[in-house]
Amino acid sequence: MTLLPDPLQPVLLATVRLAGPYQAQPAETELYAAISRRHTNRLPFSDRRVPPAVRAELAEAAKVEGAILHMLDHDEAVRVLRLVRDAEREQLADPAYRAELARWAGGARDRDGIPDTALGPRAVDAGAPVRDFTAGRPGPRGYAWFEKDPQLAVLSVPAGDRASWLRAGQALQRVLLTATARGIAASPLTQPLETADAWLVRDPRSGHEQPQMILRIGYGLPVPPTPRRPVSQVLN
């Protein structure tokens, strides 16, 4: 696979060429088996901590793809969650944003968007570490207590160019599949990364990396898959 193979075709992001027979390595087979089991989990997680060995494995998965995964300590997680809530509050004040959420989230869906079954409950204490896709609209979500000390990680890349963005996507895939293979649930938090103040999410100890994704990780109950378009509609 070659990223950005033709400077004259900026929308051509990658080319993939078929080669001869290939014997997959055990680690690759494990990740492949996790594809159908990987789902975003917006349910409350338990307070059980992800073991250091698994956290290191997730960080290594990002490194393989040229990215960096910072596991946040308690104070950093509190700071980043505050950024998430501030950004979401700002976004929900925008009628266009609320209209977009209404188009893509909630209700019964068979191929696009996020159905009610995948939205997760509301937090009893109004501090859920998940995005509110309903923008406060009433619905059949119910309420639940979320984990007291959410475990967060920030996926970053060294630069802000297009090749780095693509590598971030590859790294995110490998991190999520590795997490799934280890029984770890995950859900993304991107609100502050969608604002002009995305740089505030950076690790203050380094300060130069480009954050691309905030992940909430932990142990949770299994969730059903969300609908997808048929292959015939997305692949010629």
What do the PLM-derived regions correspond to, one by one?
Residues 1-236:
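Acidic, surface-exposed loops and disordered segments
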